[in-house]
Amino acid sequence: MLPWQRQVPTSIFPQSNEQVFRMMLAQQHLQLQNFLQQRKMALLAMNPEIPMITDLKKAKFDFTHMADSIESEQKIKEESVSPKMSPTLTTAAVRPFVPYDQPWFMIPGRGRTTGRAARPKKEFICKYCDRHFTKSYNLLIHERTHTDERPYSCDVCGKAFRRQDHLRDHKYIHQKDRPFKCEICGKGFCQSRTLLVHRATHDPNRHSIGAPVVPIKSETPLPELDPRVTLILQNLTDSFNSTSMTSPQISPDR
């Protein structure tokens, strides 16, 4: 006999805590039995072909068709254990849940991420002019323009530089080897940027205003022009000069 099935004698005295606990257990047991009975009836109403679990226990195992018996029992157990919808609800009444109206890649904060937040860029600020730099080395070189610090000095002539690469380029001056040579005149230079500046001197169209143009020395002489062509050019030049000299000028009163 279960504890909650015992008969409690009536008394005029108030019930003890143990008796109250037994009554609560009995009430919960009845509610659980009612719930299981209602669920069993609902399953039978939806699919009457599904046998009850008690019938599964009583059925004998068919050893001749072992694989088929195992699959059928497993299928029946899954269908009986899986939750079913209430028979009062229909599929038309159930609407699909749409959490977002926009695609996932347009929703803020739901795009593709690398798994960690982007690190902010470091800023190195000059203490003299408040200029910002993204690398500490660039800030160090910049501050040397304010302090005029030149830690790299030449061991030949003693000239000092702010950057090590400038000292490296300077050392080419003391060497006979000049790796950057001009293809036109063959002159050698220590630095590539000096060669680029030198190449502009061979191009008359690229020289600056007022700067002397270095003529290009060519081994093959230029061909002589026909005397008739020279005479025509001279006549055109004279006529242009005479026209510009005798052209009427507009009076400012008009």
UniProtKB/Swiss-Prot annotation:
Is-annotated flag, keyword Transcription regulation?
Answer: yes
Q: Write down the InterPro entries for this protein, in alphabetical order.
A: C2H2-ZF_Transcription_Reg, Znf_C2H2_sf, Znf_C2H2_type
Gene3D superfamilies of this UniProt entry?
A: Classic Zinc Finger
> Its domain of life?
Eukaryota
Q: Which GO terms describe its molecular function?
A: DNA binding; zinc ion binding
Question: What subcellular locations does the record give?
Answer: Nucleus
Q: Per the record, GO CC terms? A: nucleus
**Pfam families according to UniProt:** zf-C2H2
Q: Where on this chain are zinc fingers (C2H2-type) annotated? A: 124-146, 152-174, 180-202
Q: List the keywords (alphabetical).
A: Developmental protein, DNA-binding, Metal-binding, Nucleus, Repeat, Transcription, Transcription regulation, Zinc, Zinc-finger
**Phenotype on deletion?**
RNAi-mediated knockdown results in defects in feeding, and failed growth and development eventually leading to lethality at the late L1 to L2 stage of larval development. Morphological defects in the digestive tract, such as enlarged pharyngeal intestinal valve lumen, leading to functional defects including accumulation of ingested bacteria in the lumen of the posterior intestine and defective elimination from the anterior lumen of the intestine.
Q: What does this protein do?
A: May function as transcription regulator. Required for morphogenesis and function of the digestive tract.
Concerning PANTHER family, the annotation shows:
ODD-SKIPPED - RELATED, PROTEIN BOWEL
Q: Which family does it belong to?
A: Belongs to the Odd C2H2-type zinc-finger protein family.
What is the protein name stated in its UniProt record?
A: Protein odd-skipped-related 2
The species this protein was found in: Caenorhabditis elegans
